[in-house]
Amino acid sequence: MSLENGTDVSFEEFRGKVVLVINVATYUGLTVPSYTQMNALAEFYVDQDFVILGFPCNQFEMLEPAANAEIMNGIRYVRPGDGFEPLMTLFEKTEVNGATEDPLFTFLKSACESTYTEFYSSLFYEPIRIGDIQWNFEKFLIGKDGKPYTRYHPDVVDPEALKDDINTLLSA
């Protein structure tokens, strides 16, 4: 996979770390609370084996319309804005569902139950599957062994709601 700047990254570099994977979008109603709270979470675990990986996605109401080279400026100057710098590793725009979904998300979705019980409209992909990610800022927590541990609904933005699970995985 590639970082937002085009640099290739091997997931081997995250071996032995607890990883939080999030599909992100700059122009979503959850953008400001999600980015600011994930920064608070990253700061809390700054000296531990914990990383957050963000994957911009335009499959939900087209709320990440920018080209890869423009996404960081949208975050810095629009939402959240004010020079905001996310404390997560940001990747290139990624398909998280459908015929062209990235294999990482195929793997994560197969290992963790969906957080939704119904589908919404304004989904821009096919085919639609029962375990699909259904909105921006859905999260997957992965243990140091690379095994998916749990999946969080996009409305879970408070870092306190994730800390027990993160602490469990860090101490494993």
From Swiss-Prot:
Biological process annotations from GO: response to oxidative stress
Gene responsible for this protein: GPx
Active-site residues, as the UniProt record annotates them: U28
Keywords: Oxidoreductase, Peroxidase, Selenocysteine
GO molecular function: glutathione peroxidase activity
Expressed in which tissues: Expressed at high levels in the ovary and at lower levels in the gill and hepatopancreas. Not detected in heart, brain, thoracic ganglia, gut, muscle, epidermis or testis.
UniProt record similarity statement: Belongs to the glutathione peroxidase family.
Organism name: Procambarus clarkii
EC number: 1.11.1.9
Catalytic activity of the protein: 2 glutathione + H2O2 = glutathione disulfide + 2 H2O
Record protein name field: Glutathione peroxidase
Pfam families with a match to the protein in the record: GSHPx (PF00255)
Record Gene3D superfamilies: Glutaredoxin
